[in-house]
Amino acid sequence: MSENHLQGKDKSSIVIGLKFGDDFVSMMTFCKSRYNKNYMWELSRYAVKRNTNVVGGFSRLLTNFRQNHSGSIISYADRSYSNGDVYYKNGFKLIKTNPPSYKYVNLGKSIKRMHRANFMKKKLAPGDSRPEWKVMFDAGYKQIFDCGTLSFCIA
């Protein structure tokens, strides 16, 4: 997951995957809903091995999860990379279009995007008069803006 998802691996409690031979070619992760408590689960990551096409991978992994876990699911599609088509095709409903936001990336180390919540100024430099972006810039990070997200749910 860490090599094949822009945000890297996460700390989800449920990880399911599809294998071809001995290699995982597709993975999906779930956790208890973090931001919207109206939903039981959050589909937090879906990744496919680079240079690999897994036809029906999303639907097979989602079906497996739903056969083994009850409750509603929420997920978010980054509009920079997705129009949400895979969600619509699998029965999800669009519930909200979220405005653009930003993440950080340290180009000297990795291209993984790191959520801004990990770098709040009050955690990094309490009492520092510089704005958050400047604290991060001075530490070698660049601010990357996205196109917003789409929030989807399925009962």
Locations of regions flagged by a protein language model:
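A conserved beta-strand-loop-helix scaffold within acyl/acetyltransferase catalytic domains
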Residues: 2-102, 109-112, 135, 139-154
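Short, amphipathic alpha-helical interaction segments positioned at domain boundaries
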Residues: 114-117
